[in-house]
């Protein structure tokens, strides 16, 4: 009949067995012993067990058991004959009547397949593929997996089942990635910080050696974990972009780097000296060249070469003016017998000296003293001429000596001529006379 399943009637034989050590017989599960007939009769569990089947399931009694099937399941009940069960031939209690083969009526029992199975054309129970027939209860977020006699609802990778729903698993919460993790529905993806590359396992990160792959630095590249550092050669400094190097102007760091002039060059610097000087081994200090000693001057034979700081001076022979007479290369004398010498210094001595520009003051630069000391005489020292700027003064240091003191720094180049006078006073013989040192001071251009 279309739409109705055929139910095959079956006969279940109940066995009546003696109880060990007891003459009383026992029946198999699902049957009960009828003491009057001595036969094992089926127990109707649908009547004796409360709520044997629950919900939309109905209870169908079977010989020796029962089935729970959907109430909407159509059942065809065909007649079948139930053979007699074989009686137990062993001893019985004396009160029991003699056993005889009872007559069972012909009953109709349905053959029903268990839930999840269906009858095929050969009246065999075969599994129902609920997934293929779309008769499952899995929701769209789940996957139906057929099993023997049923099915299961499962979730795809990256989801887990919670209260009948497939919820995305946040893999990033469990530290699947070594560095950066991005959760996506049903999966996740790992990425790395700048300076790293993702390994083949898709999870761990490996440092990128930027110096070996691209060498972004202009000069020296030093690889670090996850990055790199650019370094510059000596004499260069790293620019703000961290990649390029610019020349370092060492000369701008300090004015004392070189004694004279600092010359900057790409990556370095050097010190230079003005003409008349040479650079010392420390590569910063300048030393005067003695042109007179090395005969590297332009003085003629009549002139005297006088070395100065950074140069030289060709000094002409002295000329003694009337009434003075030249008595040596640097001395003029006024004869006492000459009436014109009465109020003039007895001698004029020519001396030369040099000082550096900007010399610190006060500074003792020249000493003057009497060569002969007469009884009853005393001496007075003074600057007779040339000190209009009040840059010097005479300090008497003893009865017959005095020192010329420079009181103000003098910037060169400059030439100064001072007449230093020593006055001799002798009260015993009522004598007063004087001598002069004509001092020529050459101030150099540089302070060294």
Swiss-Prot record:
Pfam families the UniProt entry points to: cEGF (PF12662), EGF_CA (PF07645), Fibulin_C (PF22914)
- Could you say what the effect of mutating residue 126 to M is? No effect on secretion; slightly increases homodimerization in absence of Ca(2+)
* GO BP terms in the entry: cell-matrix adhesion; elastic fiber assembly; intramembranous bone growth; negative regulation of angiogenesis; negative regulation of transcription by RNA polymerase II; positive regulation of osteoblast proliferation; positive regulation of transcription by RNA polymerase II; protein localization to cell surface
**Keyword field contains Signal:** yes
What S-S linkages are listed for this chain? Answer: 46-59, 53-68, 131-144, 138-153, 155-166, 172-181, 177-190, 192-205, 211-221, 217-230, 232-245, 251-262, 258-271, 273-286, 292-305, 299-314, 320-332
Task: Kindly list every residue the record annotates as glycosylated.
Answer: 283, 296
Where does the UniProt annotation place the signal sequence?
1-23
User: Record's GO cellular component, any one?
Assistant: extracellular region
Mutating residue 169 to T has which effect?
A: In ARMD3; decreases secretion; slightly increases homodimerization in absence of Ca(2+); no effect on protein folding
Family matches, as SUPFAM superfamilies = EGF/Laminin, Growth factor receptor domain
Q: Which residues form the EGF-like domain?
A: 42-82, 127-167, 168-206, 207-246, 247-287, 288-333
Alphabetized UniProt keyword annotations: Age-related macular degeneration, Calcium, Cell adhesion, Charcot-Marie-Tooth disease, Disease variant, Disulfide bond, EGF-like domain, Extracellular matrix, Glycoprotein, Neurodegeneration, Neuropathy, Repeat, Secreted, Signal
Q: How is it modified after translation?
A: N-glycosylated.
- Motif Cell attachment site, chain ranges: 54-56
Where in or outside the cell is it found?
A: Secreted; Secreted, Extracellular space, Extracellular matrix
Result of mutating residue 124 to P? In ARMD3; almost abolishes secretion; no effect on homodimerization
Give the start-end ranges of region Interaction with LOXL1.
Answer: 245-448
Q: What is the effect of changing residue 267 to S?
A: In ARMD3, ARCL1A and CMT1H; produces protein misolding; decreases secretion; no effect on homodimerization
Tissue and organ distribution: Expressed in skin fibroblasts (at protein level). Expressed predominantly in heart, ovary, and colon but also in kidney, pancreas, testis, lung and placenta. Not detectable in brain, liver, thymus, prostate, or peripheral blood leukocytes.
- Known InterPro entries for this protein? cEGF, EGF-like_Ca-bd_dom, EGF-like_dom, EGF-type_Asp/Asn_hydroxyl_site, EGF_Ca-bd_CS, Fibulin_C, Growth_fac_rcpt_cys_sf, Nephronectin_domain
* GO molecular function annotations of the record: calcium ion binding; integrin binding; protein homodimerization activity
Q: Which family does it belong to?
A: Belongs to the fibulin family.
- Which PANTHER family does the record match to this protein? PA14 DOMAIN-CONTAINING PROTEIN, UROMODULIN-LIKE
**Quaternary data:** Homodimer. Monomer, homodimerizes in presence of Ca(2+). Interacts with ELN. Interacts (via N-terminus) with the integrins ITGAV/ITGB3, ITGAV/ITGB5 and ITGA9/ITGB1. Interacts with FBN1 (via N-terminal domain). Forms a ternary complex with ELN and FBN1. Interacts with EFEMP2 with moderate affinity. Interacts with LOXL1.
- Its function? Essential for elastic fiber formation, is involved in the assembly of continuous elastin (ELN) polymer and promotes the interaction of microfibrils and ELN. Stabilizes and organizes elastic fibers in the skin, lung and vasculature. Promotes adhesion of endothelial cells through interaction of integrins and the RGD motif. Vascular ligand for integrin receptors which may play a role in vascular development and remodeling. May act as an adapter that mediates the interaction between FBN1 and ELN.
- What is the name listed in the Swiss-Prot or TrEMBL entry for this protein? Fibulin-5
Biological source species: Homo sapiens
What gene does the UniProt entry assign to this protein? FBLN5
């Amino acid at each position: 009949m279309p739409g109705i399943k055929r139910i095959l009637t079956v006969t279940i034989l109940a066995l009546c067995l003696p109880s060990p050590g007891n003459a009383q017989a026992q029946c198999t599960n699902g049957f009960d012993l009828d003491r009057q007939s001595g036969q094992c009769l089926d127990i109707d569990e649908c009547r004796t067990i409360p709520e044997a089947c629950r919900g939309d399931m109905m209870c169908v009694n079977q010989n020796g058991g029962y089935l729970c099937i959907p109430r909407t399941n159509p059942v065809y009940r065909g007649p079948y004959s139930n053979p007699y069960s074989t009686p137990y031939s062993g001893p019985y209690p004396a009160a029991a009547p003699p056993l005889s083969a009872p007559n069972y009526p012909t009953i109709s029992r349905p053959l029903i397949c268990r839930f999840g199975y269906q009858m095929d054309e050969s009246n065999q129970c075969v599994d129902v593929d609920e997934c293929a027939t779309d008769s499952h209860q899995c929701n769209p977020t789940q996957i139906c997996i057929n099993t023997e006699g049923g099915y299961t609802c499962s979730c795809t990778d990256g989801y887990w089942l919670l209260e009948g729903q497939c919820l995305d698993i946040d893999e990033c919460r469990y530290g699947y990635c070594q560095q950066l993790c991005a959760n996506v529905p049903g999966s996740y993806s790992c990425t790395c910080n700048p300076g790293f590359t993702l390994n083949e396992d898709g999870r761990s990160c490996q440092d990128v050696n930027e110096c070996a792959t691209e060498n972004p630095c202009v000069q020296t590249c030093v690889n670090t974990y996850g990055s790199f550092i650019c370094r510059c050669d000596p004499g260069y400094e790293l620019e703000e972009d961290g990649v390029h190097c610019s020349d370092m102007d060492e000369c701008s760091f300090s004015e004392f780097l070189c004694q004279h002039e600092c010359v900057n060059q790409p990556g370095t610097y050097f010190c230079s000296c003005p003409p008349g000087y040479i650079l010392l081994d420390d590569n910063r200090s300048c030393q005067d060249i003695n042109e007179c000693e090395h005969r590297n001057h332009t003085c003629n034979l009549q002139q005297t070469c006088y070395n100065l700081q950074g140069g030289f001076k060709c000094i002409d022979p002295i000329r003694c003016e009337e009434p003075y007479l030249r008595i040596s290369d640097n001395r003029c004398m006024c004869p006492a017998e000459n009436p014109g010498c009465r109020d003039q210094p007895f001698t004029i001595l020519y001396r030369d000296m040099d000082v550096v520009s900007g010399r610190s003051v006060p500074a003792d630069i020249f000493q003057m003293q009497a060569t002969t000391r007469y009884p009853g005489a005393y001496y007075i020292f003074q600057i007779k001429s040339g000190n209009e700027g009040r840059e010097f003064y005479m300090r008497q240091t003893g009865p017959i000596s005095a020192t010329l003191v420079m009181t103000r720094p003098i910037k060169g180049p400059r030439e100064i001529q001072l007449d230093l006078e020593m006055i001799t006073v002798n009260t015993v013989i009522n004598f007063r006379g004087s001598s002069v040192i004509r001092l020529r001071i050459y101030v150099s251009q540089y302070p060294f």
